[in-house]
Amino acid sequence: STLFTLTATAADEPAAAGKAARILFVTQSKGFRHGSVNRKDGQLSPSERVMTELGIQSNLFRVDCTQDVEQDFTKEKLQNYDIVMFYTTGDLPIKQADRDYFFNEWLKQKGHGFIGVHSAADTYHNYEPYWDMIGGTFNGHPWGAGSTVTITVHDAKHPAAKPWGDEFVIQDEIYRFKNWQPEKVRVLMSLNMAKTQLKHPYHVPILWVKNYGDGKVMHMSLGHREDVWTNETYQKSLLGGIRWILGQEAGDATPNPELSAAQEKKAKADTEAAQ
């Protein structure tokens, strides 16, 4: 197992929290391997480096990075963590008993947190407990990594969405989703279809949160490109989500399916009007 850990010294730990939270950042790829999780010469990948540095700079958390779930994603080792974060692809070789423990006792009952980033939605396609937890499954990306897109923020009060303002333009690869469950999630940001060139419009969520039993789940679709990881607003957004999961900042996770329905309807109307 290659578990990368950068430990902050006791003096660096936040006084208010008593001790820093711990995050297990899983960057293993069983499908497509993104450049942002690609380790070179035994060094941390770009996304792992950013998460590790964010933890130290914020005094909020410490990160262990793994690309070996068989070794590091076990019932025994999960006891050490407050949040699990996935930037993964494919069917990860996590033992069934460890998966069951993670979904049920660790996340739902103990009230820990899960953060999925970008291709976390391109993981365990045919495994319902996973997509039921995360909220949706990768269904292609009509907008490739070079696409410049406009994103609308729907809930600027939530700490994960607040850093972005009301609307912003960014260059990144954008996923669309199947197994989408609007009745279970709160969409914080979505693709602005009126400003997007696409013949088949629909609602494309970008950032959402949900309660999962007593646990909290956040999925951030952005993060394909390495320059997104070094974007300060993106980092603040992840930090806001972490603070929300840890209960340090309030944010609403009430599902807003009516927003998804309205966005879908508006996207179709905008497209028809443009023709």
What are these regions (language model features)?
Residues S29-F32, V69-D72, T89-P93, F114, ...:
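Solvent-exposed loop/turn segments at secondary-structure junctions
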Residues K30-E48:
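Glycine- and acidic-residue-enriched helix-capping/strand-helix junction motifs
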Residues A11-A20, T27, S47-V50, Q57, ...:
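Extracellular ligand-binding/catalytic regions of CAZymes and related secreted enzymes
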Residues S1-T5:
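Bacterial N-terminal signal peptides
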